[in-house]
C-alpha cells in the first residue's frame, strides 16, 4: 500500500514539472555481486544510480506511460527516466524492489516465462511476480523461451518461422495473464535482437518493441525498436551513467544501409542517416563503433542534413552497433544520441554463439 501511495503522489506531482519531449530508458538484468559482470551491476552501484536520479531532480515514470505520451505528442516532465529489468532474475526482487519501493518509483520487468515455469535457479517464481504486480510493477513480455527469435531453424520456411515465433510470444503473454493478470503491450526482444520481419510480428500483435541499443526516446523514435541504455559493471560508473540519463534523441528521420540485410546477415558497408533540425551542433556530429573506434562521416546534403557513415574494419559474427552523437547547442555535457544495430552470421552461414 505504501508503494501505491508513493507512486500516486509522484504521478500527481509531475503536472507541475517543466515539460520535455523525450525520455531515457535504462535496462538492468542482475543487481548482484555474484552474477556475470556483463549483465550485472552491484547493489552499491545501483544505489548510486538511484541517488543520482533523485539528487538531480529526475522523474521516474512507468515505461508504458512514457511511450503512450510520446506517441500521442504529449509533454513529459523534464528529465524523465524509466527503469526496466530483463529476464525476471531473483535479485530484482531481493535487491532492486526494496530500493525502488522505498522511493516510490515505478519500474518494469520483462519476463521470460519458461524460466519461471521451470524454476531456473536465478529466476523469480510466480508468487514473487504476483507480489510485484500487486505492488504496481509492470510485467512486460520477453518471450517464452528467450530464444534468438530472428533466427530460422535449419530448413525452416518463413511461414513456419513466423508461426513458431508468434506462438512463443503468445505463450509468454498467456502465462503472464494467467499467473499475474498482466496484459502489458510492451515486448522486449531477447538479446535485443530484431529484424524487420520480427518487428512486423510484434506490430501485428499490438506490441511496442523494446530493444537494447543505446539512445533516448522521442516522438520520432521507432516504436518497434525503442532504445534503452544497458547498465552493467562496465557501464555503471556515475560519469557514464550521467551521460546516459541526460542524453536526448538525435532526430533521425530516415535510415538506409548498404551491405547488411536480414536475409544473409552480411557485414554493413555504409549507414546513411537523414536528420531533422534540432538543438544540437551538427558540425560536431560523430559516429563510432561500439568499441569506441571513430568512423568516417561524409555530409551528403545540408538541407535536410544527410550523412554517410563508412563502416570499415573487421566485422566478426555477432551483434554490431554504431553510435552517432552530437553535443547539445547550449547544455554542456548533454549529447543527442542515435544507435544502429545489425547482426552478422558466421562465414559458413551459421549463427554465432552467445
Regions found by a protein language model. Give the residues of each.
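Terminal accessory/targeting
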Residues: 1-79, 101-107, 112-124, 130, ...
Amino acid at each position: 500500500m505504501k508503494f501505491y501511495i508513493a507512486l500516486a503522489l509522484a504521478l500527481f506531482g509531475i503536472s507541475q514539472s517543466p515539460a520535455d519531449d523525450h525520455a531515457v530508458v535504462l535496462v538492468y538484468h542482475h543487481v548482484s555481486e555474484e552474477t556475470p559482470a556483463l549483465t550485472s551491476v552491484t547493489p552499491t552501484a545501483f544505489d548510486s544510480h538511484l541517488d543520482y536520479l533523485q539528487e538531480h531532480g529526475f522523474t521516474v515514470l512507468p515505461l508504458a506511460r512514457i511511450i503512450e505520451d510520446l506517441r500521442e505528442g504529449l509533454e513529459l516532465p523534464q528529465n524523465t527516466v524509466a527503469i526496466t529489468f530483463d529476464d525476471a532474475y531473483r535479485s530484482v526482487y531481493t535487491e532492486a524492489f526494496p530500493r525502488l519501493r522505498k522511493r516510490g518509483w515505478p519500474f518494469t520487468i520483462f519476463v521470460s516465462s519458461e524460466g519461471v515455469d521451470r524454476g531456473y535457479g536465478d529466476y523469480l517464481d510466480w508468487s514473487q511476480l504476483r507480489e510485484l504486480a500487486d505492488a504496481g510493477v509492470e510485467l512486460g513480455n520477453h518471450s517464452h523461451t528467450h530464444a534468438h527469435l530472428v533466427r530460422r531453424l535449419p530448413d525452416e520456411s518463413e511461414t513456419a518461422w513466423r508461426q513458431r515465433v508468434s506462438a512463443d510470444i503468445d505463450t509468454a503473454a498467456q502465462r503472464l495473464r494467467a499467473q499475474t493478470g498482466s496484459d502489458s503491450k510492451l515486448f522486449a526482444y531477447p538479446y535485443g535482437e530484431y529484424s524487420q520481419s520480427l518487428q512486423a510480428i510484434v506490430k501485428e500483435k499490438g506490441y511496442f518493441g523494446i530493444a537494447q541499443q543505446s539512445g533516448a526516446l522521442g516522438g520520432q523514435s521507432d516504436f518497434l525498436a525503442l532504445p534503452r541504455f544497458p547498465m552493467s559493471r562496465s557501464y555503471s560508473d556515475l560519469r557514464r551513467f550521467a551521460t546516459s540519463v541526460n542524453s536526448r534523441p538525435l532526430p533521425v528521420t530516415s535510415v538506409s544501409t548498404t551491405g547488411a540485410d536480414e536475409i544473409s546477415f552480411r557485414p554493413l558497408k555504409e549507414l546513411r542517416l537523414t536528420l531533422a533540425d534540432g538543438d544540437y551542433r551538427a558540425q560536431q556530429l560523430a559516429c563510432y563503433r561500439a568499441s569506441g573506434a571513430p568512423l568516417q562521416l561524409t555530409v551528403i546534403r545540408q538541407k535536410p542534413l544527410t550523412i554517410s557513415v563508412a563502416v570499415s574494419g573487421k566485422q566478426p559474427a555477432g551483434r554490431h552497433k554504431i553510435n552517432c552523437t552530437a553535443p547539445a547547442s547550449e547544455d554542456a555535457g548533454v549529447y543527442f544520441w542515435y544507435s544502429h544495430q545489425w547482426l552478422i552470421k558466421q562465414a559458413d552461414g551459421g549463427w554465432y554463439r552467445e
